[in-house]
Regions:
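Conserved flavin/dinucleotide-binding core of flavoenzymes
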Residues: 308-418
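Short beta-strand to alpha-helix junction loop
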Residues: 57-64, 140-141, 152, 188-210, ...
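Helical element adjacent to the flavin cofactor pocket in flavoenzyme catalytic cores
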Residues: 183-233, 240
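Mobile amphipathic helical/loop "lid" adjacent to a hydrophobic cofactor/ligand pocket
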Residues: 63, 67, 71, 76-176, ...
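N-terminal Rossmann-like FAD-binding beta1-loop-alpha1 element of flavoenzymes
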Residues: 4-31, 411
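Hydrophobic/small residue at the entry helix of a nucleotide-binding pocket
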Residues: 13-14, 38, 402
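Glycine-rich FAD pyrophosphate-binding loop
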Residues: 23-47
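Mid-domain catalytic core of redox enzymes
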Residues: 225-334, 338, 342-343
Length: 418
């Protein structure tokens, strides 16, 4: 293609949404992606007929921007049951949303996961987080999530047996130092909609977005070495020019391209996928570890959500470990199997390890203060813009929003009508 109007560095969700908004306004785009495919962290690998999402991820269907940008019907979404199965003191306890699963309300109320008062406060928390608009959440007084939960009146019991393992699996932060604003936003999204997986894996989300761009708009295997005046230089020396450049990469890579040394620290995770013949749990619930044991924090069985995640007659188990582990794959597999045999019995020894994912930058640290993702967009220069998690909060919702807003800033800078 001839020189595009806009060069976008990175074909993750932010970059793709930015490109689509630019195309809607008649601007030509070229996305340069260093890896071999679109999606950024939202990728799925196919191994021996199994679909392995790169790190445990779900689509929260209440995300407003996802509702605007995605065709849920075409994604063929499959849903987790609302709630969790919590491992505590050698037993499993069902902890479900009584408003969605009234038949399980009594079991949840009588479980040792929190007091009766705690469970009543969860209803109050749901009401609190669903008040006002999303911008309102990011204007409320900010604290750590742990401080917020304690101030709300929750006991140490429910904090340690539910909130800590659950939120550790969401934000990869055992200390619950994540901003209370992020917690309120996340809790609102979980309570307002479903947690789902596309039938063909999380990769279906970026692939759906990419399919709406003209052929030739995306170039993979194109790593950008540096940003130049209204253009970029690729590794290998090729220079590409446009009227504007948008950097839509992960935070550390964006900082590198901008020449900034003050890089926001990251939260890492390790994920192990196993194949098995019989699922260790009977229904599509998230399993949370409230015993404080190592290494697994949470697990799920994606095939109970969407059978297409595995070949016929087999099941897939996805485990999540907080942080990146230094052990080799065999040693880590042994640790995980030993732990899970205590949960599910000796049959775990027959599970077959499919792959280990070590993701050092699973999310940026999101401790207070966090930026308001609804604030007016600020460009870096008259022709250079950023979007995604760089100096912003991280979630699928805000990745999409930041891409759209970056595109609108570019359109205004290039004097195009919105």
């Amino acid at each position: 293609m001839s020189s595009p109007d806009v060069i976008i560095v990175g074909a993750g969700l932010s970059g793709l949404c930015c490109a689509l908004r630019l195309r809607e306004n008649g601007l030509s785009v070229l996305l340069l992606e260093a890896s071999d495919g679109v999606g950024g962290r939202v990728r799925t690998d196919q191994v021996d007929g199994f679909l392995l999402d790169r790190g445990f991820q779900v689509l929260l269907t209440a995300y407003p921007e996802a509702q605007l940008m995605l065709d849920y019907g075409s994604l063929n979404l499959r849903y987790f049951s609302p709630g969790a199965l919590i491992r505590y003191d050698g037993h499993f306890y069902r902890f479900v949303d009584p408003l969605r699963r009234p038949k399980d309300a009594l079991v949840t109320m009588l479980s040792p996961i929190g007091t009766i008062g705690d469970k009543m406060r969860i209803a109050l928390l749901r009401r609190r987080t669903r008040q006002g608009t999303l911008p309102d959440i990011y204007r409320r007084r900010e604290a750590t999530t742990l401080q917020y939960l304690k101030k709300f009146g929750f006991s140490e019991n429910i904090i340690n047996r539910f909130f800590r393992p659950f939120l550790s699996g969401v934000y990869f932060d055992r200390n619950l130092d994540v901003s209370s604003r992020m917690f309120e936003f996340g809790f609102r999204m979980f309570s307002a909609g479903g947690a789902a997986l596309p039938a063909c894996g999380m990769r279906a989300i970026p692939e759906q977005l990419a399919s709406r761009l003209p052929e030739g708009s995306i170039r993979t295997g194109a790593r950008v070495q540096s940003v130049e005046e209204r253009g970029v230089r690729l590794v290998g020396g090729e220079v590409m020019k446009g009227r504007a450049v948008v950097i839509a990469t992960e935070g550390p890579e964006t900082a590198r391209l901008l020449g900034e040394k003050d890089i926001l620290p990251s939260r890492g995770m390790t994920g192990l996928y196993f194949a098995c013949e019989k699922p260790p749990i009977p229904e599509p619930l998230l399993v949370l570890n409230a015993e404080g044991s190592e290494p697994v924090n949470n697990l799920c069985v994606p095939t109970l959500v969407s059978p297409s995640y595995a070949p016929h007659g087999e099941h897939l188990v996805a485990t999540t470990i907080i942080g990146t582990r230094d052990e080799g794959d065999e040693a880590l597999e042994a640790l995980v199997k030993t732990q899970l045999q205590g949960w599910f019995g000796p049959g775990v020894e027959k599970w077959r390890l499919l792959r280990v994912y070590r993701i050092p930058h699973a999310l940026p640290v999101q401790a207070p203060p966090v930026s308001d993702p609804t604030d007016p967009f600020v460009k870096v220069s008259p022709w250079l813009f950023t979007c995604g998690e760089y100096r912003n909060v991280a979630s699928l919702q805000w990745a999409m929003v930041s891409g759209r807003r970056a595109a609108e800033a570019v359109i205004q800078a290039l004097n195009q009508p919105l």
